[in-house]
Amino acid sequence: GGGGEPDGPEGPAPLPEGAGEKGAEVWADLVERGVEGFRMVLAPPEYYQRPLEFRMGVVGAASVDHLCKSIVMENTRAPEELQGCEDPTYSKYYMVIVQYTAKLNAEKLKSFVHGLAGGRLPKKKINMRLVSEEVNDRLTGFAHNAVTPMACATQIPLIISHKILALSPDFFWLGSGEVDLKVGFSAEKFIQVYQPYVADCTND
């Protein structure tokens, strides 16, 4: 902050009752890293069976475009020596954050990953696919529909769709470690803290 003035009077948003162990870890990660103004909402069990308009109402999102998800992608053609994700510019895995209303574009993602690698990875050695459930669980520690960058078991390099940064108001929603827990925050604050790459990675 500027000049060390105290935090706002509100402090962090409360952890919803019944948020679960993983949800508590995500909450603690956000608080520890100083992500201000986030909100957590416990969704009803039928959340994923219902349309986006229903989900928007549950969390209080400004529009269906503000509902986003984190997907772990794997380069299935990565060379033998490329196994992990220690180097964010040269990684076998990326966690990509996109809107539910947008479709991830594999070719755009491939081009972006190719650019990050700076010549170390020829395009024919890139084929980005959704990871299997088993790999997802091992890398993230989260179940399907609960994946999130916060408190993730492995530090997977992050890519966020540039469209999320253009949302107005600047407050988007993500999974939060448990299937029925959602978290919302400003893209600007999220980027400051978690420092994802910003990419044009969805269909126009």
Cite the ranges covered by each PLM segment:
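Extended, low-hydrophobicity, polar/charged segments
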Residues: G1-D204
